[in-house]
Amino acid sequence: MSEHNPYGTMHATTIITVRKGGKVVMAGDGQVSLGQTVMKGNARKVRRLSKGDVIAGFAGATADAFTLLERLEVKLEQYPDQLMRAAVELAKDWRTNKYLRNLEAMMLVADRSVTLAITGNGDVLEPEHGTIAIGSGGNYAFAAARALMDTDRSAEEIARRALEIAGDICVYTNHNVVLETLDAE
């Protein structure tokens, strides 16, 4: 437990993005845990931004993530149809701004052409194998998705199955899956 939060650490979620077969799918589970307690099982941590042209998912402190999503929306308005540029500008602000520097969250964002992970360390990472995952069950979901990429399964089927596997292993991930899909280039 921290001195500021008597309930312990907030653990929340698994988010995965899969790009395959002309589709990009982002999926997230719905669990929010506070310490050893499941506070909510149907949270929506994957959503559309920028008039539906961008999908975003977050892991970490919810209020921090919403702050970052709002800032990303502003960057997308400044740099329309330039997700990479908007993400880099957000990461620069996140790293250098005294207030933003303390935000505890990670984000995955995707549009028709690119998928990115954005961190508070100033990282903007593009996956090389068509999939990337974050959050408490991110490594499990990522490994499962990588194993399924060579099968005949669709991007949606891979994302859903990867989250199911993560939910079977990670106590901070449940099986309430929310999916968003875009046509990819």
UniProtKB/Swiss-Prot annotation:
<keyword id="KW-0888">Threonine protease</keyword>
<dbReference type="GO" id="GO:0009376">
    <property type="term" value="C:HslUV protease complex"/>
</dbReference>
<comment type="subunit">
    <text>A double ring-shaped homohexamer of HslV is capped on each side by a ring-shaped HslU homohexamer. The assembly of the HslU/HslV complex is dependent on binding of ATP.</text>
</comment>
<feature type="binding site">
    <location>
        <position position="167"/>
    </location>
    <ligand>
        <name>Na(+)</name>
    </ligand>
</feature>
<keyword id="KW-0645">Protease</keyword>
<feature type="binding site">
    <location>
        <position position="170"/>
    </location>
    <ligand>
        <name>Na(+)</name>
    </ligand>
</feature>
<feature type="active site">
    <location>
        <position position="13"/>
    </location>
</feature>
<dbReference type="InterPro" id="IPR023333">
    <property type="entry name" value="Proteasome_suB-type"/>
</dbReference>
<keyword id="KW-0479">Metal-binding</keyword>
<dbReference type="GO" id="GO:0046872">
    <property type="term" value="F:metal ion binding"/>
</dbReference>
<keyword id="KW-0378">Hydrolase</keyword>
<feature type="binding site">
    <location>
        <position position="173"/>
    </location>
    <ligand>
        <name>Na(+)</name>
    </ligand>
</feature>
<comment type="function">
    <text>Protease subunit of a proteasome-like degradation complex believed to be a general protein degrading machinery.</text>
</comment>
<keyword id="KW-0963">Cytoplasm</keyword>
<dbReference type="InterPro" id="IPR029055">
    <property type="entry name" value="Ntn_hydrolases_N"/>
</dbReference>
<dbReference type="GO" id="GO:0004298">
    <property type="term" value="F:threonine-type endopeptidase activity"/>
</dbReference>
<dbReference type="GO" id="GO:0051603">
    <property type="term" value="P:proteolysis involved in protein catabolic process"/>
</dbReference>
<dbReference type="InterPro" id="IPR022281">
    <property type="entry name" value="ATP-dep_Prtase_HsIV_su"/>
</dbReference>
<dbReference type="Pfam" id="PF00227">
    <property type="entry name" value="Proteasome"/>
</dbReference>
<comment type="similarity">
    <text>Belongs to the peptidase T1B family. HslV subfamily.</text>
</comment>
<protein>
    <recommendedName>
        <fullName>ATP-dependent protease subunit HslV</fullName>
        <ecNumber>3.4.25.2</ecNumber>
    </recommendedName>
</protein>
<keyword id="KW-0915">Sodium</keyword>
<keyword id="KW-0021">Allosteric enzyme</keyword>
<dbReference type="InterPro" id="IPR001353">
    <property type="entry name" value="Proteasome_sua/b"/>
</dbReference>
<dbReference type="GO" id="GO:0005839">
    <property type="term" value="C:proteasome core complex"/>
</dbReference>
